């Protein structure tokens, strides 16, 4: 059995889909379906069982999980970068992760988990090194602190531990995220509603719509996850992006090209985001390449086209 926490969420559901494509259905989904609309991501997937996150955590602590767990993909977290309840964030993203990590280590079960590019925050360098890590919000801090915890354990670990610092992931099965869904999704919805796509005006030295991020298609994220699953001798913390920064304007142009209509409107940059916003990210994927991952990553033009076609299927 494979455990996927956050399995009803964006990346978790896509990992399950990728496993299903391999014929793997012996999967335990762990999530919180208090928001019942999130069932939609699971309805098209094949899994063995579902367990509420609270029950799962209690059973982890009580050593009462099913036998034969072969790997844990730990995608469950609060990923809202605007959430400032630090106690809530640390319980969900740090303490929960530590408990599950030690359960896996005690049983030599591979543990593959979601970190985040938010650990870099205000940095203008994006290497998996301490001097590059300057989180701007408590979400980024919660992910960074768990990475720090993992770093201390890695040298003595006797089973696989892999952390993925996800950059700006977009693609199928993110619709439930609301305001935290990708810019590609929101621009697509705006054009469908008869509006022009809207981007922020320039800020922090960038032109209108010129802020740049490393936008990575979720299919590529799943491929990297499964490559490490297939190579359990590889451990570490790795950036998971394309290694290529592209502007929000590039995303808007890809959406406009798909629809064949629309022109970008620029809106004022929100005061509440000033000083808390990453205007530029670009993954340094040297470490990922050094361990043997060779596949290429989709650029914005091809990734957005595939994504919008999926949304309109």
Curated annotation (Swiss-Prot):
Gene3D superfamilies in the cross-refs: NAD(P)-binding Rossmann-like Domain, UDP-galactose 4-epimerase, domain 1
Biological processes, Gene Ontology terms: ADP-L-glycero-beta-D-manno-heptose biosynthetic process; carbohydrate metabolic process
A Pfam family the protein falls into: Epimerase
Note on cofactor: Binds 1 NADP(+) per subunit.
Essential cofactor(s): NADP(+)
Pathways per UniProt: Nucleotide-sugar biosynthesis; ADP-L-glycero-beta-D-manno-heptose biosynthesis; ADP-L-glycero-beta-D-manno-heptose from D-glycero-beta-D-manno-heptose 7-phosphate: step 4/4
Active site as annotated: 139, 177
Keywords tagged on the record: Carbohydrate metabolism, Isomerase, NADP
Catalytic activity, reaction form: ADP-D-glycero-beta-D-manno-heptose = ADP-L-glycero-beta-D-manno-heptose
EC numbers on record: 5.1.3.20
Binding site for NADP(+): 10-11, 31-32, 38, 53, 75-79, 92, 143, 169, 177
Superkingdom as given in the UniProt entry: Bacteria
MF term (GO), any: NADP binding
Residues the entry annotates as binding substrate: 168, 179, 186, 200-203, 213, 277
Family named by the database record: Belongs to the NAD(P)-dependent epimerase/dehydratase family. HldD subfamily.
Subunit structure: Homopentamer.
NCBIfam families: heptose_epim, PRK11150.1
General function of this protein: Catalyzes the interconversion between ADP-D-glycero-beta-D-manno-heptose and ADP-L-glycero-beta-D-manno-heptose via an epimerization at carbon 6 of the heptose.
Record remark: domains: Contains a large N-terminal NADP-binding domain, and a smaller C-terminal substrate-binding domain.
Protein name in the entry: ADP-L-glycero-D-manno-heptose-6-epimerase
Organism listed in the record: Marinobacter nauticus (strain ATCC 700491 / DSM 11845 / VT8)
